[in-house]
UniProtKB/Swiss-Prot annotation:
GO BP, sorted A to Z: phosphorelay signal transduction system
The UniProt record lists the keyword Metal-binding: no
Pathway listed: Nitrogen metabolism; nitric oxide reduction
Name of protein: Anaerobic nitric oxide reductase transcription regulator NorR
Organism: Klebsiella pneumoniae subsp. pneumoniae (strain ATCC 700721 / MGH 78578)
Superkingdom of the organism of origin: Bacteria
NCBIfam families per the UniProt record, alphabetical: PRK05022.1
Residues that coordinate or bind ATP: 215-222, 278-287
SUPFAM superfamilies xrefs: GAF domain-like, Homeodomain-like, P-loop containing nucleoside triphosphate hydrolases
Key words of the record: ATP-binding, DNA-binding, Nucleotide-binding, Phosphoprotein, Transcription, Transcription regulation
Record flagged with keyword Iron: no
One Pfam family named in its UniProt record: GAF
Length: 516
């Protein structure tokens, strides 16, 4: 044998360590890299025609955030289809998914590559990949030895997946376990705040409580709502979405509750509202803080009694709907200031979820960047999208006032810029491809600096200052045209006028001017 009994014992000990699965697999991958003398190794979980990295060693950190779709990675597809050890020759025409992703060797191609598919019975559950810069790196190891390693790792991975499934079933009502659940919405992040959020999602998802999801714009509140729905007994039923900020007051009640024919001008037929569409499922009300007090009262009645009335109809309809609401406002302060009903707030916030801003989960920036790089690679038909080390450092130094959405847009823009200046189907993202609004990273943004100069500024004042600055800039960029400004900010123009008036940007309700 090319490795000793002691080395096998090290592998077995790593697999049986009394630590969490993530740490156990990381230790295992490090041990395998040392024993086999490879330059990089990775443990991947197989799901939905893609491989998801669980642990890596010797690879760039952003690999943990990448999702390797089989159709875009021929070598991984070959490993998935094989029932045994796969050795790729040094002159293989198939591109290696890790080319350019080994620190210190970004400009070199991986030469030696071995793939070990991992099975539970006849079911593919993952893969172990071993890469080396030397063409003969793994020649001294027989297929039998590699199969032994694969069997040990597959057993540990299968146990971890079974435990995770049992834990998920344990928090669901017994009757829900019998139904096939859709694929869970993945939330990228391994930082402490995100691991805590994922735990809270698992806990509240299994209940039927209404949930208030709070967080800054761009943090991923809709993603959290999807995860709650998909982890609930209602997962097989509809998840209906409604953006309250884009809802004109004149049609808001009809959108929520529906209307009957003739209820108002233009009501030419009966129409179901969002509550009816979500019956037996979940209704996600985004930006709920934008609802008028009158609509808040009607929403409260639905939550209290479970019935609705279509506009123009005297009859009540029973609905069974779980409500998930999201806001970027401090609703407690809104209650104090009389803009949000206290009773509705308490109905919604029995189990609140708070989505942390990206600046509070700094270690997730590179993972998310890797995820978006891989998305761009697939969409644009590129062989590789590589994040240079200097670019990774720059991303980690930025404060991300726009959160995950800003990072996503920054990656997409950088890929387009890099592709325009680099030949071939491989792009390398460098610091110059990322252009941020403020030169000094990790410092208060211009918007924050424009806030009232007082040491006692609260979240409400900071939010108002940010919104006031954003609207002012957009209005200036659109030459004072309110309709164009509303489109740029993705808001309903009537809601924008109301918000601008509240923020002191307008002295009176809008008239019918040429500016819209």
């Amino acid at each position: 044998m090319s490795f000793s009994v002691d080395e096998l014992a090290r592998i077995a000990i790593d697999l049986q360590s009394d630590i969490g699965h993530t740490d156990r697999f990381s230790r295992l991958i490090t041990t395998l890299r040392q024993i086999l003398g490879c330059d990089a190794s990775a443990l991947l979980r197989y799901e939905a025609h893609q491989f998801v990295p669980l642990a890596i060693d010797g690879l760039a950190q952003d690999v943990l955030g990448r999702r390797f779709a089989l159709e875009g990675h021929p070598r991984l597809e070959a490993i998935a289809r094989a029932g045994d050890v796969v050795r790729f020759p040094a002159d293989s025409d198939l591109p290696d998914p890790y080319d350019g992703l080994i620190p210190g060797h970004e400009s070199l191609k991986v030469h030696a590559c071995v793939g070990l598919p991992l099975f539970a019975g006849q079911t593919l559950i993952g893969a172990l990949t071993l890469d080396g810069m030397d063409a003969d790196r793994f020649d001294s190891f027989s297929d039998e030895e590699l199969r032994l390693i694969a069997a040990l790792v597959a057993g540990a991975l299968n146990n971890a997946l079974l435990i995770a499934r049992l834990e998920a079933q344990n928090v669901l009502p017994a009757q829900a376990v019998n139904y096939p659940l859709p694929e869970r919405q993945e939330i990228i992040g391994l930082s402490g705040p995100m691991l805590q959020l994922k735990k809270e999602i698992d806990i509240v998802a299994a209940s039927d409580l209404n949930v208030l999801i709070s967080g800054e714009t761009g943090t991923g509140k809709e993603l959290v709502a999807k995860a709650v729905h998909q982890g609930s007994p209602r997962a097989a039923n509809p998840l209906v979405y409604l953006n309250c900020a884009a809802l004109p007051e004149s049609v808001a009640e009809s959108e929520l509750f529906g209307h009957v024919k003739g209820a108002f001008t233009g009501a030419i037929s009966n129409r179901s509202g969002k509550f009816e569409m979500a019956d037996n499922g979940t209704l996600f009300l985004d930006e709920i803080g934008e609802l008028s007090l009158a609509l808040q009262a009607k929403l409260l009645r639905v939550l209290q009694y479970g019935d609705i009335q279509r506009v123009g109809d005297d009859r009540s309809l029973r609905v069974d709907v779980r409500v998930l609401a999201a806001t970027n406002r401090d609703l407690r302060q809104e209650v104090v200031e009389g803009r949000f009903r206290a009773d509705l707030y308490h109905r919604l916030s029995v189990f609140p979820l708070s989505v942390p801003p990206l600046r509070e989960r700094e270690s997730d920036v590179v993972l998310l960047a890797g995820y978006f790089c891989e998305q761009c690679r697939l969409r644009m038909g590129l062989a590789r999208v590589i994040l240079a080390e200097a670019a990774r450092n720059r991303l980690q130094q930025w404060s991300w006032p726009g959160n995950v959405r800003e990072l996503e847009h920054a990656i997409h823009r950088a890929v387009v810029l890099a592709r325009a200046t680099q030949a071939g189907d491989e792009v390398v993202l460098e610091p110059q491809h990322f252009q941020f609004a403020v030169a000094a990273p990790m410092l208060p943004t211009e918007t924050a600096a424009a806030a009232p100069a007082t040491g006692n500024i609260n979240l409400r004042e900071a939010t108002d200052s940010f919104q006031r600055e954003a609207i002012s800039r957009a209005l200036e960029a659109n030459q004072g045209n309110w309709a164009a400004t509303a489109r740029a900010l993705e808001l309903d123009v009537a809601n924008l006028h109301r918000l601008a008036k509240r923020l002191g940007l307008k002295g009176s309700p809008p008239g019918k001017s040429s500016a819209g």
